[in-house]
């Protein structure tokens, strides 16, 4: 599943091709992805794209009459192509531009979404969510205070979008390993110093992943079709049974909150 770095990489990749361009047409080849595609999106035809933003794992394509809100789901990707490039089997949405390009949304599993928000309004999917992890609002003190009285496993806690957005499964496992914190520990058991260390590693891991173009394990590709290269930096995720890069012990795997979790029982405590 594309996580925050992959969505941010997509935003950075498409922005030079979309910004200040006019949307000539929107083409939908399916009526429904995860949710029904709203008819209000057709209002964006003929409008100039003013800004391409991101909140959590949602891309926001802004015009004067409203915004398209895009979620990549489990297997979605966005590519910028020549407008006459033939559409493939899983190419469900085209946003044709005045510069002769098309923003094409591909999603084999159809778990993604294209939604509409009126000017100045936030869509319900963006309500009641936590701060962005790469901002100053996300720090060790904030997490220490949020953690008080919480018995849930720390990995599950940092993946809760109501606490902080965008820390997905890959980056949660990697950040906990780099922080030397066991993913099963009760959230409230972490000290203020441990929270500061974990927050620092979350920020570093996400930023490095963005700089590496994200992580391609199966479906994700950048806007130019290239894979992300952070997979080469993974230390524990997907490596059950392999040797820990720090101590040589076998990397362990278990499920926390129905998500596969990877860790070193010797290095993490």
Curated annotation (Swiss-Prot):
InterPro entries the UniProt entry points to: DNA_glyclase/AP_lyase_DNA-bd, DNA_glyclase_Znf_dom_DNA_BS, Formamido-pyr_DNA_Glyclase, FPG_cat, MutM-like_N-ter, Ribosomal_uS13-like_H2TH, Znf_DNA_glyclase/AP_lyase, Znf_FPG/IleRS
Name of the molecule in the record: Formamidopyrimidine-DNA glycosylase
Summary of subunit composition and partner proteins: Monomer.
HAMAP family recorded: Fapy_DNA_glycosyl (MF_00103)
Functional note: Involved in base excision repair of DNA damaged by oxidation or by mutagenic agents. Acts as a DNA glycosylase that recognizes and removes damaged bases. Has a preference for oxidized purines, such as 7,8-dihydro-8-oxoguanine (8-oxoG). Has AP (apurinic/apyrimidinic) lyase activity and introduces nicks in the DNA strand. Cleaves the DNA backbone by beta-delta elimination to generate a single-strand break at the site of the removed base with both 3'- and 5'-phosphates.
Catalytic-site annotation from UniProt: 2 (schiff-base intermediate with dna), 3 (proton donor), 57 (proton donor), 259 (proton donor)
Single GO MF annotation: 8-oxo-7,8-dihydroguanine DNA N-glycosylase activity
Gene3D superfamilies given in the database record: 1.10.8.50, MutM-like, N-terminal (3.20.190.10)
Keywords associated with the record: DNA damage, DNA repair, DNA-binding, Glycosidase, Hydrolase, Lyase, Metal-binding, Multifunctional enzyme, Zinc, Zinc-finger
UniProt record similarity statement: Belongs to the FPG family.
Residues noted as binding DNA in the record, renumbered to the chain: 90, 109, 150
GO biological process, one term: base-excision repair
Cofactor or coenzyme needed: Zn(2+)
Highest taxon, organism lineage: Bacteria
Cofactor descriptive note: Binds 1 zinc ion per subunit.
EC number: 3.2.2.23, 4.2.99.18
Species in which this protein is naturally found: Vibrio vulnificus (strain YJ016)
Zn finger limits (FPG-type): 235-269
Catalytic activity: Hydrolysis of DNA containing ring-opened 7-methylguanine residues, releasing 2,6-diamino-4-hydroxy-5-(N-methyl)formamidopyrimidine; 2'-deoxyribonucleotide-(2'-deoxyribose 5'-phosphate)-2'-deoxyribonucleotide-DNA = a 3'-end 2'-deoxyribonucleotide-(2,3-dehydro-2,3-deoxyribose 5'-phosphate)-DNA + a 5'-end 5'-phospho-2'-deoxyribonucleoside-DNA + H(+)
């Amino acid at each position: 599943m594309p996580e925050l770095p992959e969505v941010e990489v997509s935003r950075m990749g498409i922005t030079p091709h979309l910004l200040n361009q006019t949307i000539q047409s929107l083409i939908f080849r399916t009526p429904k992805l995860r949710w029904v595609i709203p008819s209000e999106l057709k209002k964006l035809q003929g409008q100039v794209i003013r800004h391409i933003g991101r909140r959590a794992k949602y891309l926001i394509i802004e015009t004067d009459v409203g915004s398209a809100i895009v979620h990549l789901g489990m297997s979605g990707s966005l590519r910028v192509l020549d407008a006459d490039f033939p559409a493939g089997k899983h190419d469900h949405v085209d946003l044709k531009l005045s510069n002769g390009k098309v923003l094409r949304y591909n999603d084999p599993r159809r778990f993604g979404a294209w939604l509409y928000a009126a000017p100045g309004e936030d869509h319900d999917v963006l309500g009641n969510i936590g701060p962005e992890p790469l901002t100053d609002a996300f720090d060790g003190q904030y997490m220490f205070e949020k953690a008080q009285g919480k018995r849930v496993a720390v990995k599950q806690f940092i993946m809760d979008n109501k606490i902080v957005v965008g820390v997905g499964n890959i980056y949660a496992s990697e950040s906990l390993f780099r922080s030397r914190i066991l993913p099963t520990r009760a959230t409230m058991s972490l000290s203020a110093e441990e929270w500061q260390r974990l927050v620092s590693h979350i920020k570093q891991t996400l930023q490095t992943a963005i700089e590496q173009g994200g992580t391609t394990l199966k479906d994700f590709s950048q806007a130019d079709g290239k894979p992300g290269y952070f997979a080469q930096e993974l230390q524990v995720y997907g490596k059950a049974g392999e040797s820990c890069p720090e101590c040589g012990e076998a990397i362990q795997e278990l499920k926390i909150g129905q998500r596969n979790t990877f860790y070193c029982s010797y290095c993490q405590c």
